[in-house]
From Swiss-Prot:
Binding site for substrate: S95, H96, N97, H98, R117, Q241, E313, S314, Q315, S535
Positions of ATP binding: Y53, K92, D495, G532
Binding residues for Mg(2+) 1: E94, N533
Name of one Pfam family that matches: AIRS_C
Species of the source: Brucella canis (strain ATCC 23365 / NCTC 10854 / RM-666)
Residues the entry annotates as binding Mg(2+) 2: D118, D269
Keywords carried by this UniProt record: ATP-binding, Cytoplasm, Ligase, Magnesium, Metal-binding, Nucleotide-binding, Purine biosynthesis
Active site positions, chain numbering: H50, H96 (proton acceptor)
Name this protein carries in UniProt: Phosphoribosylformylglycinamidine synthase subunit PurL
Oligomer and partners: Monomer. Part of the FGAM synthase complex composed of 1 PurL, 1 PurQ and 2 PurS subunits.
NCBIfam families: FGAM_synth_II, PRK01213.1
Length: 740
């Protein structure tokens, strides 16, 4: 039976593929004829935002991407950074937002699967995962179902695959009611001489399909991920892929074994737009053409058309260019792991992307125009408006600061995430030194006595909404600060830029200014961006998400015996605030959660201060002077010391300092840390801080079972712990809504 690959190309069909009339005109001019149905699908997949970055490319080029430790920057499946001794860390963050809203379990699971593949396709064994999740307001009827599905999906895939989840974020805001965010991060370890790239080399060489069979799942997924949602969202369920972590585990082992055999010339995982994107990227990067014969593609469904095979996003698949003499050896490895291995085409020297099905040519397109020379836009953008200054004296005070602290520490955004991370395997592989719940996750580097890596993921979307430039800076600074607070040296970062519709100048303005802020902070902090992902059109019925440029970073600890945790303080220790007192309440959680206001500017990020204070803290930790360390962020000083008290199970008696109590307690000024140390060490730290020009203040002493701050706060650590640990399980059990 012959499967029909033809359909009439109508304006409706073109629009359904997300192609604008001018883009279709460009296709006609490029190929000099009407495209086939398969070709239309290929253009639609390769020219959408998800694959081409057409709206953001111009601005992404401005980011700092190189540094003394950077081995591979953006443009590959993941970034590669040197960690010494011939080892490198390979990492990236990527979104799976749209699929996770439609089908939370599979959407999140395949997001984890996709990012793990990005790491091991480079030749690295995954050693750590994180996920940054944003949901709608807790009261929204869908939120609990989405949280439950996404967390189960992330855990179900990561746990079965066997990678520890070491960190992440979970936040709630009504602006995510119609579009949740699932940003998945993975990191792996490799040797310098064992890094594999996706650039095809050599003509007439076999192109090999590896892994699971191809089905109809996920057809059109990349196109869906580049569109806004509306009322027809339920119809999009078939565009969500289905993942199998056990197949992926076999694929990992088979790929690493194959790489060790010397058979691999180039390798690319099949992610968005499946076979189309992986083949085009490999060919275009190597300035080669690719010919595919679809009759050789392993399929698990009958009568699949060329269009379906080319655009399927079935999971756990790879494409590779192979050394011909190694074919038998390569095939034996994949058969051993129970995976498909099929030669589905060859490299050519004519820069054409040719697809053959049932003996007929169903696509013949210029490969460069699909790949690195795809359309690029310089979209109009508007400078975001600025908030007027908001002095702390203009912000109302609360009558009862103890009650305010209990309310904030037990709020949806600041309470413990234990309910989430207890569903993840945080200890598998046996190298975890710090699990979620602190400033950064830390794992030992296998094969080294003392070396460890620290990981954090951060962004404060409400700051980005108020001021995308400062918000972009702050996301980088907080990630850098969290890594620093363990004693690690931040090495490099990856960005996951989640925004609304870039065709709206105000949204495009948010993206442009956030990238500017990120770039400025990365340059100032020597924290280059080595990989990343952009997710646009996160809007439903015209309502955009908060601008959310998530930054994930990796840091290096030369000796993990000199490492700080947030829960390490001991009775009798002195607590020291480094970096100055709180003054800034604009865009604070104090204003938002106690007064339901989003007023004032985001806090200013002084990058020179950030660097100086951070380097001071890091050296104190590495010199063994510190028993605990925590950076200040949401909720300021009061929340930071409350978390330290909860994690160490100890109280403290502190002096809030001179000034307005709400600003001293809850101000969100940046570049600040609280450390604990023995009284003798605290004196030395104070002396050193004075010499280094780092503002400091002795806060008080650790001890007892209550947290007392001046005359304002007096609350038991038990009550703090109950509020902190209670919100999430109670919410998931249906016992409460938003803010109680």
């Amino acid at each position: 039976m012959t499967i029909s690959n033809t359909r009439d190309i109508t304006p409706e069909l073109i629009e359904a593929h997300g192609l604008k009339p001018d883009e279709y005109q460009r296709i006609l001019e490029l190929i000099g004829r009407e495209p086939t149905f398969t070709e239309l699908g290929i253009f639609s997949a390769m020219w959408n935002e998800h694959c081409s970055y057409k709206s953001s490319k111009k601005w992404l080029r401005t980011l700092p991407t190189s540094g003394p430790r950077v081995i591979q920057g953006p443009g590959e499946n993941a970034g590669v950074v040197d960690i010494g001794d011939g080892d490198c860390v390979v990492f990236k963050m990527e979104s799976h937002n749209h699929p996770s809203y439609i089908e939370p379990y599979q959407g999140a699971a395949t997001g984890v699967g996709g990012i793990l593949r990005d790491v091991f396709t480079m030749g690295a064994r995954p050693v750590a995962a994180m996920n940054a999740l944003r949901f709608g307001e807790p009261d929204h009827p869908k939120t609990r179902h989405l949280v439950s599905g996404v967390v189960s999906g992330v855990g179900g895939y990561g746990n079965a695959f066997g990678v520890p989840t070491v960190g992440g974020e979970v936040n709630f805001d009504k602006r995510y009611n119609g579009n949740i965010l699932v940003n998945a991060f993975a990191a792996g370890l490799a040797r310098h001489d064992g890094i594999f790239l996706s650039e095809a080399k050599g003509v007439g060489l076999p192109v090999v399909y590896l892994g699971a069979k191809t089905g109809r799942d996920g057809v059109g997924g990349a196109t869906m991920a580049s569109a806004e949602f509306d009322e027809s969202i339920e119809e999009k369920r078939p565009t969500v892929q289905v993942g199998d972590p056990f197949t992926e585990k076999c694929l990992l082992e088979a790929c690493l074994e194959l790489m060790a055999s010397g058979a691999v010339i180039a390798i690319q995982d099949m992610g968005a737009a499946g076979l189309t994107c992986s083949a085009v990227e490999m060919g275009a990067k190597g300035d080669l053409g690719i010919e595919l014969i679809l009759d050789h593609v392993p399929v698990r469904e009958e009568n699949m058309t060329a269009y379906e095979m080319m655009l399927s996003e079935s999971q756990e698949r790879m494409l590779m260019v192979l050394k011909p003499e190694k074919e038998a050896e390569a095939q034996a490895i994949f058969r051993k792991w129970g995976l498909d291995f099929a030669i589905v085409g060859k490299t050519t020297d004519d820069l054409r992307f040719r697809v053959i099905h049932q003996g007929e040519e169903v696509a013949n397109l210029p490969i460069k125009d699909l790949g690195d020379e795809a359309p690029e836009y310089d979209r109009p953008w508007m400078e975001p408006g600025k908030h007027a200054p908001l002095p702390a004296s203009n912000v109302p005070q609360v009558e009862d600061y103890s009650a305010a602290l209990l309310k904030l520490i037990g709020s949806p955004d600041l309470s413990s995430r234990r309910w989430v991370y207890e569903q993840y395997d945080t200890l598998i592989q046996g190298n975890s030194l710090q699990v979620p719940g602190g400033d950064a996750g830390v794992i030992r580097v296998e094969g080294h006595e003392t070396k460890a890596l620290a990981f954090s993921s951060d962004v404060t979307p409400r700051y980005c909404e108020a001021d995308p430039f400062e918000g972009g800076k702050q996301a980088v600074a907080e990630c850098w600060r969290n890594i620093t607070a363990t004693g690690a040296e931040p090495l490099a970062s990856t960005d996951n830029l989640n925004f609304g519709n870039p065709e709206k100048p105000e949204i495009m303005g948010q993206l442009v200014k956030a990238i500017e802020g990120i770039g400025e902070a990365c340059r100032a902090l020597d924290f280059p961006i080595v990989s990343g992902n952009v997710s646009l059109y996160n809007e439903t019925n015209g309502q955009a998400i908060l601008p959310t440029p998530t930054i994930a970073g990796v840091g290096l600890l030369p000796d993990w015996s000199q490492m700080a945790k947030i829960g390490g303080m001991q009775d009798g220790d002195t607590l020291v605030l480094l970096g100055g007192d709180g003054t800034h309440l604009g865009q604070s959680v104090y204003l938002r959660d106690l007064f339901d206001r989003a007023d004032g500017p985001a806090p200013f990020v002084d990058l020179a201060l950030e660097k100086r204070n951070g380097e001071f803290v890091r050296s104190a930790i590495r010199n063994g002077q510190v028993t605990a360390c925590h950076d200040l962020s949401d909720g300021g000083l009061a929340i930071a010391v409350a978390e330290m008290a909860i994690k160490s199970g100890k109280g403290a008696t502190l002096d809030a300092g001179d000034g307005l109590p709400h600003a001293l307690l809850f101000g969100e000024d940046q570049a600040r840390y609280v450390i604990s140390a023995t009284p003798e060490m605290a004196k030395l730290i104070a002396l050193n801080a004075e010499g280094a020009g780092v503002p400091f203040r002795i806060l008080g002493t650790v001890g007892g079972d209550r947290l007392k701050i001046s005359k304002n706060v007096d609350v038991s650590v038990a009550d703090l712990t109950q509020a902190y640990e209670g919100w999430f399980p109670n919410f998931m059990n249906g016992e409460l809504t938003g803010n109680n």
